[in-house]
Amino acid sequence: ESNLTTIAELWGVYLERHVDPSDVAVMMTMLKIARIKLNPKNSDNWIDGCGYLSLGAELIVDKPEPEPPVKFQGGKT
């Protein structure tokens, strides 16, 4: 994740807009798809594309949505 975060920060500076690490995972996957289109017999592009998708999935799994707050129902403590 830290590599995707670093790339996101650098791309964000260059593009002058916020880039999320998950954006990096998607765009790197698209880069690999473009390379597959040019040379579908290079297995490294297929493998790397899967790797970037996997890294993107890890970003989602590592950030579970917060639980909604539980409203106090009263009673004695």
Residue ranges of model-derived segments:
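Intrinsically disordered, low-complexity regulatory regions
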Residues: 1-77
